[in-house]
Design a protein with these regions (language model features):
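Residues at the starts of beta-strands that form the adenosine-phosphate
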Residues: 3, 27-29, 63, 90
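Alpha-helical elements of the RecA-like P-loop NTPase motor core of helicases
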Residues: 14-18, 75-78, 145, 193
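Short, solvent-exposed amphipathic alpha-helical segments in soluble enzyme
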Residues: 20-23, 81-83
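Phosphate-bearing ligand-interacting subdomains
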Residues: 38-96, 100
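Structural signal for interior beta-strand "rungs" in well-ordered beta-sheet cores
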Residues: 93-203
Length: 203
């Protein structure tokens, strides 16, 4: 069991803690959050510092995961991922034992796959993504870096979701379309055609 530090102490952090505890591969040494929250606890784990303390934390702990959520903008998660890489942290994929990931699929570094998510054969998921509870990534789909595939959403076969896209809860996509980078797909929507980058679709 290796030590790991979590970066971000909000609601998404709680979900990731639950996955890490279920996975039983890592020992959480603490959480990094804003300076005013130092000393507070999240599900019993202490907030031990802010971003400014990460280099010092790295001396004794080499693993980290971004636990800031991603509602619409990917920028906070993207910035923290880059900062952690720059310091030298290893960012393992965190995968719930209750998720199903085909042996013919791939999941990038720093990505978190939540309980009861499914990633089917031939699918490729990029770095620093959230594949949230009960999300389905179908065969041969590609999810870019820094994407959030939200709860109970369906990315159908062969779909390409480009980098930094937010795919909302219970949204679905037609098979074999391309969703351009930095798009926002609102909860409950059906995407039936390819979209240019920075698209915004709402129900």
């Amino acid at each position: 069991v290796q030590d790991i530090v979590l970066v971000g102490g909000g609601g998404h952090c709680k979900s990731v803690i639950d996955v890490i505890e279920s996975e039983a591969k890592f020992n959480i040494i603490g959480i990094i959050d804003t300076a005013e929250n130092i000393g507070k606890k999240v599900l019993g784990y202490e907030i031990i510092g802010s971003d400014d303390d990460l280099a010092e934390v790295f001396i004794s702990c080499k693993n980290a995961v971004v636990t800031v959520g991603q509602i619409k903008s990917s920028e906070p998660r993207k910035r923290l991922f880059a900062l952690l890489k720059e310091i030298g942290f290893y960012l393992p994929a965190i995968i719930s034992p209750l998720a199903y990931i085909s042996k013919h699929a791939s999941v990038g570094e720093g990505t978190v796959v939540m309980h009861h998510a499914l990633i089917n054969a031939g699918a490729n998921v990029g770095k620093n993504c959230i594949i949230n509870t009960k999300a389905l990534v179908e065969h041969d789909a590609t999810i870019g870096d820094h994407c959030h595939i939200s709860t109970a959403s369906v990315v159908n076969g062969g779909v390409v979701v480009q980098d930094e896209t937010f795919f909302g809860s219970n949204a679905t996509s037609k098979e074999y379309i391309v969703i351009g980078e930095s798009s926002i797909i609102g909860g409950g929507t059906s995407v039936m055609r390819s979209l240019e980058k920075n698209a915004f679709i709402k129900a």
